[in-house]
Design a protein with these regions (language model features):
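Thiol/disulfide oxidoreductase modules built on the thioredoxin-like
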Residues: 136-192
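Structural microenvironment flanking redox-active thiols in thiol-disulfide oxidoreductases
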Residues: 80-140
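Short active-site neighborhood of thiol/selenol oxidoreductases, capturing the structured segment around
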Residues: 58-79, 85
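Short loop/turn microsegments at loop-to-beta-strand junctions
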Residues: 42-43, 65, 164-166
């Protein structure tokens, strides 16, 4: 399953790489993650958070924001990603107040507002979870070039979710800058986030 995740993540990145040639600068910072600055996607996100408040990407301007698409019943990739973000936020100390994690559920049928609220609280109370109707979530995933699909579970009627395993990083001005592949490691991501925090 992870192989599929990586392939989908790579496809999401490659689809934006051909946009970079016209926007890259010789003075641009060097990142460990994939630099997608200037990508013509991941520009809109219009869903509702775990407290029932409508949210858009504009709400997170002023902070370096990491957006991740996943689901709460994910057994490995999703909790690992959110746990790493919580560790990074804590390690940044006061600077961590300018880092915002946003979790977008791809399983709104099971991930109710209450479920998402409890899930985020298990990592960091400042983390935001977003949900919508299946149609709204599908539209959001399409905007970010994120793949997801139901997969049969171990028992009758149960299911898991196949999905792109990676995060999108926005700078404090609200511009998408990086795609971070799952498994990239805490240290490289921390370094990239510090670079963006330092330039904001």
């Amino acid at each position: 399953m992870l192989r599929r995740f990586f392939l989908c993540g790579a496809a999401a990145v490659l689809s934006g790489c051909d946009k970079l040639g016209t926007t890259a600068s010789s003075n641009a910072p060097s990142f460990r993650a994939v630099d997608i600055t200037g990508a013509e996607y991941a520009r809109q996100l219009d869903l509702v958070d775990q407290n029932g408040q409508p949210r858009t990407l504009a709400d997170f301007k002023g902070k370096v924001t990491v957006v991740y698409f996943g689901y709460t019943q994910c057994p490995d990739v999703c909790p690992t990603t959110m746990s790493e973000l919580a560790q990074i936020k804590k390690s940044l100390g006061k600077e961590g107040d300018r880092l915002q994690a946003v979790f977008v559920t791809i399983d709104p049928e099971r991930d109710t507002a209450a479920v998402l609220k409890a899930y985020m609280a298990g990592f960091d109370p400042s983390f935001v979870a977003l949900r919508g109707t299946v149609a709204q979530v599908t539209a959001a995933a399409k905007e970010f070039k994120v793949f997801f699909a139901k997969a049969p579970g171990a028992s009758d009627g149960s299911y898991t979710m196949d999905h792109t395993a990676g995060s999108f990083v926005f700078d404090a001005q609200g511009r998408v800058r990086l795609f971070v592949r799952y498994g990239a490691g805490i240290e490289p991501l921390t370094a990239d986030l510090k670079t963006l925090l330092g330039s904001s």
